[in-house]
Every structure is written in structure tokens, then in C-alpha cells.
Amino acid sequence: MSGKSTLQPKTIFPNLPAIAGVRLAAIAAGVRYTGRDDLLLVEFAQGTRVAGVLTRSQTPGAPVKWCRKLLPKGQARGLVVNSGNANVFTGRSGEVVVSRTAKAAAEIDPHSRSLY
């Protein structure tokens, strides 16, 4: 697979100012591409309110199911975004990966039950 997405913007994004209550980190984890950032972790301040819009697919992947379960709570401490596609048939193995990812990300706040 090529290291460059056809959807990649032609221009460089400007440096953005810090957003109070939000911390971002991105790494090249090898999820989808080699040598470029493909995993994002967002940490939100305690008490952050959230909402979401998810696929209407009748066959959503495990990450979408996870978010559907958590979104009604309306709060989040963290968000994990990868460059893969959530509308996939991953079955039980996908659910295990989502759960493990959330547990790893929960090191932000080990008592949190609000990591998307």
C-alpha cells in the first residue's frame, strides 16, 4: 500500500492554537500506512460533553457499536481514531481489539468508562 493517501490535502495545515481541556497525540502505528501518522489519541478534560454521528449501516464494525453504547452517557475522557474503516465484518475479534484499545487508552483516567 502506498504511503500517501489520495485524500491528503495539497497544502500544509497551519499550526493551531491550543484548545483548553484538550490534548492531542498522533503516531505512525502502522495501522494502515507505513511512515505516516495513522493513530490519534485525544484526551478531554473531566466532564467534557460529547455527541456523535455514526454510520447508518446495518453492518457496523465493533468501533461503531462501542460508540453507540457509550454516546448516550454524553461524556468523554478520550477518543481514539485510526485510519482504518469501522464498517467492516470483524466479529468477535474486532470487539476484543476495541475493548483492548479502550483499556490501553484508559490510562488517561483508569476509572473512566467514557473512552470512544
Q: Where are the regions a protein language model picked out?
A:
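Molybdopterin (Moco) oxidoreductase catalytic core of the xanthine/aldehyde oxidoreductase family
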Residues: 1-7, 108, 112-116
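N-terminal amphipathic/basic leader segments beginning at the initiator methionine
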Residues: 1-55
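Catalytic-core regions of core metabolic enzymes
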Residues: 18-19, 29-30, 53-56, 64-70, ...
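Short glycine/serine/threonine-biased micro-segments
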Residues: 19, 33, 76, 82, ...
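Short coil/turn connectors at secondary-structure junctions
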Residues: 35-38, 59-61, 73-78, 110-114
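Conserved active-site and cofactor/substrate-binding residues in soluble primary-metabolism enzymes
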Residues: 36, 55-59, 76, 92-100
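Active-site-flanking structural segment that lines cofactor/substrate pockets
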Residues: 42-76
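Alpha-helical support elements that line or immediately flank enzyme active sites
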Residues: 80-110
